[in-house]
Amino acid sequence: MGRFIFVSFGLLVVFISLSGTEAGFCCPLGWSSYDEHCYQVFQQKMNWEDAEKFCTQQHTGSHLVSYESSEEVDFVVSKTLPILKASFVWIGLSNVWNACRLQWSDGTELMYNAWTAESECIASKTTDNQWWSMDCSSKRYVVCKF
C-alpha cells in the first residue's frame, strides 16, 4: 500500500510540473496556437493602420502577425491559404524605407526628397509568403498574433 501511495504521489508531482510547459499552452476560442503564440485569420479587408488597430482590440498584446522563423511562416500559410485562397494579408511591417539611411551614388547625404506622401506597408502572399510592398491605404486581409 505504501509503495502505491509513493508511486501515485510521484506521478502527481510529474503531472503538476509538466502542466506549465508548452503542452499546456492554450489559446482563446477561435485562435490557433503555434510555439506559445496565438493566431487568428480574419476575412475582413482593411487598410494597414486599421488592421493593426483592429488586432490590438482583439486581445491584449495582439498585433498584426510577425514572423520569427520559416516554420512559423509555414504554420500561418497553412491557416490562411484554405480560408483566403490566393490573396494578400497585412503583416506587421510598415514604413520600411523610412528606417533606411539613403544616400546618393556620389556619396552625398540625401537632403532633399520628393517621395510621395504614401507610406509603404508590407503584405504577404497567402500562397507562398512572398512579401510585397504595398500602399498602406489599400485593403488587405488580416492575421493577428499575440
UniProtKB/Swiss-Prot annotation:
Domain C-type lectin positions: 34-145
Coiled-coil ranges (or none): none
Family annotation (SUPFAM superfamilies): C-type lectin-like
Disulfide bond annotation, renumbered to this chain: 27-38, 55-144, 121-136
GO terms for MF: toxin activity
Description of post-translational modifications: The complex is glycosylated.
Signal sequence interval, chain numbering: 1-23
Record keyword Signal present: yes
Free-text tissue specificity from the UniProt record: Expressed by the venom gland.
GO cellular component, one term: extracellular region
PROSITE patterns, sorted: C_TYPE_LECTIN_1, C_TYPE_LECTIN_2
Record localization: Secreted
Keyword annotations of the record: Disulfide bond, Glycoprotein, Hemostasis impairing toxin, Platelet aggregation activating toxin, Secreted, Signal, Toxin
Family: Belongs to the snaclec family.
Note: Negative results: does not act by binding GPVI (GP6) and integrin alpha-2/beta-1 (ITGA2/ITGB1). Does not bind to platelet GPIX (GP9), GPIIb (ITGA2B), and GPIIIa (ITGB3).
Name of the protein this chain belongs to: Snaclec mucetin subunit beta
